[in-house]
């Protein structure tokens, strides 16, 4: 008799995705981050659901309701900090997951990669509207500054900004709609993640060598389920260490001051995971140029398959490209640091150089280096 997991319409889908899935036998720990992102999403949806039970999306009571959650709700403080630091974990996993895709040439799976870029944009949008909800100083001014960037769009810009605000400034209408967006977007992310997996399972996973692994595959369960559980335990260990010892390490102290439209904070900056993009935005003196640079910094990922000139898929056997990849990582860390600094000398020039280098590496140096490596191998 055939096992029910192979015949039942629903269980068959789960079986083919997580149990009997043929997986390459040599995928390393860098392949753990897909499952970790799934866990992060589930964790964020669950903690967010419990927070939404006590939160009020009104400018008069939003800040107080978050304080109430932390002080009066049973275990409210841990739910709130798991949600806030869970977002940081989400982005750490996201950046590593994208970096893995760049390093090992996973972007040659076009549909999977493009859905992934859409997912990245959606998660960034969700995190942005979520940061506005506690209605602290940085929430209010962050929302004002970032939504204002849309006014750079010619002709319709100003009308568009006021339409998003629901008035002439960031106010009650803005907070209410941002809460609605923040509630619905994670479910859209979950749906997109399923499409992401669907396309991935059409081709099968990539592996560190970048060559087809059809000849040497193993069942996903028990080998990779055990490996994923180890990754999940380490993720929870890291997250709970943050939550229980230094819950405010990655937050901004200004957000513990209730929003005040009459008092601008000295340094307006987003959460740490947006600082690299914020630094690129600030490095262009022109408003429209800055907005275009900001969007391009993420949208450039869609061009990766077109910019791939190497005869090899993975970087594992390409030392020159490896060096360039790690320079890119260092450059992104530099941009993250610059994004958190005030707009003054020498930070302005460092930010501009780092921004130029970011686009230069991806658009020019990587394709040229790949071609040089092809010639060195006489291909």
From Swiss-Prot:
Signal peptide: none
Subunit structure: The cytochrome bc1 complex contains 11 subunits: 3 respiratory subunits (MT-CYB, CYC1 and UQCRFS1), 2 core proteins (UQCRC1 and UQCRC2) and 6 low-molecular weight proteins (UQCRH/QCR6, UQCRB/QCR7, UQCRQ/QCR8, UQCR10/QCR9, UQCR11/QCR10 and a cleavage product of UQCRFS1). This cytochrome bc1 complex then forms a dimer.
Annotated heme b b562 binding sites: 83, 182
Residue ranges of the TM segments: 33-53, 77-98, 113-133, 178-198, 226-246, 288-308, 320-340, 347-367
Record GO terms (molecular function): metal ion binding; ubiquinol-cytochrome-c reductase activity
Compartments where located: Mitochondrion inner membrane
Principal cellular location given in the protein's record: mitochondrion
GO term, biological process aspect, one: mitochondrial electron transport, ubiquinol to cytochrome c
Protein's UniProt name: Cytochrome b
Positions annotated to bind heme b b566: 97, 196
Keyword entries, A-Z: Electron transport, Heme, Iron, Membrane, Metal-binding, Mitochondrion, Mitochondrion inner membrane, Respiratory chain, Transmembrane, Transmembrane helix, Transport, Ubiquinone
PROSITE patterns: CYTB_CTER, CYTB_NTER
Source organism of this protein record: Muntiacus crinifrons
PANTHER family: CYTOCHROME B
Family: Belongs to the cytochrome b family.
């Amino acid at each position: 008799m055939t096992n029910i997991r192979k015949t039942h319409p629903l269980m068959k889908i789960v079986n083919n995705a997580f149990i009997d899935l043929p997986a390459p036998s040599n995928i390393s720990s860098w392949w753990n981050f897909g499952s970790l992102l799934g866990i992060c999403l589930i964790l964020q949806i669950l903690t967010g659901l419990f927070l939404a039970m006590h939160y009020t999306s009104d400018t008069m009571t939003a800040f107080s309701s978050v304080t109430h959650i932390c002080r009066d709700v049973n275990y409210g403080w841990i739910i709130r900090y798991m949600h806030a630091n869970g977002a940081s974990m989400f982005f750490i996993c996201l950046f590593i997951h994208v970096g893995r895709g760049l390093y090992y040439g996973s972007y040659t799976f076009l549909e999977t990669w493009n859905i992934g870029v859409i997912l990245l944009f959606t998660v960034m949008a969700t995190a942005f509207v979520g940061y506005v909800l506690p209605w602290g100083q940085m929430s209010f001014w962050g929302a004002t500054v970032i939504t204002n960037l849309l006014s750079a769009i010619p002709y319709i810009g100003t009308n568009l900004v006021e339409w998003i605000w629901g008035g002439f400034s960031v106010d009650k209408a803005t907070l209410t709609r941002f809460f609605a967006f923040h509630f619905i977007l994670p479910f859209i992310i979950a749906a997109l993640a399923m499409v992401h997996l669907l396309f991935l399972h059409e081709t099968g996973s990539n592996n560190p060598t970048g060559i087809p692994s059809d000849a040497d595959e193993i069942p996903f369960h028990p080998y990779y389920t055990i490996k994923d559980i180890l990754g999940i335990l380490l993720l929870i260990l890291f997250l709970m260490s943050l939550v229980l010892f230094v819950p405010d390490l990655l937050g901004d102290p200004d957000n513990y001051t209730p929003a005040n439209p009459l008092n601008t904070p000295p340094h307006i900056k987003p959460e740490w995971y947006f600082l690299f993009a914020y630094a690129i935005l600030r490095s262009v003196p022109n408003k429209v140029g800055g907005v275009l640079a900001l969007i391009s910094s993420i949208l450039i990922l869609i061009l990766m398959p077109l910019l791939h000139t190497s005869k090899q898929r993975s970087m594992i056997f390409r030392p020159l490209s490896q060096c360039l990849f790690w320079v890119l990582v260092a450059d992104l860390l530099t941009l993250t640091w610059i994004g958190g600094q005030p707009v003054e000398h020498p930070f302005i020039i460092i930010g501009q150089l780092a921004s130029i280098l970011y686009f230069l590496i991806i658009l020019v140096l990587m394709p040229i280096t790949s071609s040089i490596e092809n010639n060195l191998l006489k291909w």
